[in-house]
Amino acid sequence: MRTWWRVIFDKLLGKKGVSSPLDMESIFKGSGATALQAQAYRGYPASLPLDAGIGAYLVRFLVSEGCMERLTLALSQIGYLVLPELDTQVIERSGDHSGKKVMLFLHPSFAGTIVSFASDDLDVLEALQQTRLAPPLPADSFPWIDPEALGSLQGDVEYWWMNFWLPFWVSLNQEEQLALDLEPEWREFVAIHHPSALSSSAG
């Protein structure tokens, strides 16, 4: 039985039950990636649980336009040259003979870019976690929505909340949450759907 993240990456690869030139198992075969430090799961963006069958860790998050530029710069500084015009690419680390690589997928959505990647290089995750990446603000992702009129989370809003906004929000401390330029209505929305944010919104 395939896990949900494998289904997502299969869709990104364009698989339809047949082999693909971009096959994660083949690309990362023999990488030796077997464990991640605890920080890989605590930082932002966080890794999904490592799958020994793939030999790489998987990460998925949403970034704003400005943060996308910082992301490509951070990767270039450790030897990975990203071509933003390509939505799917496998990049080997420049000047490194160990065969470390990144398999990167870029998809425009929610007024930003959904970044999905697999890698056997822990330097990549560390670099991204130190870059302070952030998604677009809720009002930018959903300019047509009145948050005060929203009831339960559903559809695109639920998908955005569970997969992108909430993981980012909980990675912030209270001071960082208060510093975000959230409109009052969206701040209240966050507080309602994530109760621990109530103290942050009370400021």
Region spans (language model):
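Polar/charged low-complexity regulatory segments
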Residues: 2-203
